A protein has these predicted regions:
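Polytopic transmembrane helical bundles with strong interfacial aromatic enrichment
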Residues: 1-228
């Protein structure tokens, strides 16, 4: 991730704060109310960017897993782990915000007949199981290889989950983006874009923060082994 290595972490954190301030202001003071859902529709500007960021996190984790298998890189293995960890966090927030939105708008927390919901849950649980695999095997190249293969298998679920909304024609998940363009007003689309960029910036900030922490922890362990 060469771009993030060139930009200091505090700069990313500062940009994230600024972007979120702008996004929240636009969500509550710029974007118009939905005629059918009213104020509750504003959850959309949080829920969908969070979900897309979760997809991006899992995808980035799979890409780093592929790089590990190709180059046998411990760094790529660590980056894959951190990306998937962030994906699980954003996945949890996706399920939480989606359930709240569904309860307010449609009177139910969950609909098992909705393909998008169920497939995202399967994707989420699949990557949760990644950590069960990782912590059940001794650290080393064998564990890194197994986790990388597992992460790559999971990436197949991402387009299936993403495209489910276009296949199922769900009422709970109306199709917002079509071949004819976004099905929203200009101000709504601009607000959505700013919120999405803010969420991606948050992911990069958390990703780099966790990576830095893991690297420091690894160096401390190496020093302890040398001293011992």
């Amino acid at each position: 991730m060469s771009l993030t290595r060139r930009i200091p972490l505090p700069a990313f954190a500062g940009a994230t704060v600024v972007l979120f301030t702008i996004a929240i202001s636009m969500i509550f003071f710029y974007a118009p109310d939905d005629p059918n859902q009213g104020l509750s529709q504003r959850i959309f500007y949080f829920h969908v960017p969070i979900a897309l960021t979760a997809y991006a996190s899992f995808g980035w984790g799979a890409w780093k897993a592929l790089l590990h298998l190709w180059k046998r890189s411990e760094t790529a293995d660590l980056e894959s782990y951190v990306a998937i960890h962030q994906g699980v966090i954003f996945g949890s927030l996706t399920l939480l915000t989606g359930s709240i939105w569904a309860k307010i708008s449609w009177g139910t927390w969950w609909v098992w007949g909705d393909d998008e919901l169920v497939l995202f849950l399967v994707l989420f649980l699949f990557y949760c199981a990644y950590f069960m695999l990782r912590y059940s095997v001794e650290p080393g190249m064998a564990r890194a290889n197994m986790c990388a293969v597992y992460a790559l298998f999971g990436v197949v679920l991402i387009p299936i989950s993403f495209l489910a909304i276009r296949i199922s024609r769900s009422i709970i998940h109306p199709e917002v983006f079509t071949l004819n363009g976004p099905q929203m007003t200009g101000s709504q689309f601009l607000t959505f874009c700013v919120a999405f960029v803010a969420m991606l910036s948050l992911f990069v900030t958390l990703y780099q923060t966790e990576l830095a922490g893991k690297r420091i922890d690894s160096r401390i362990k190496e020093l302890r082994e040398l001293i011992a």
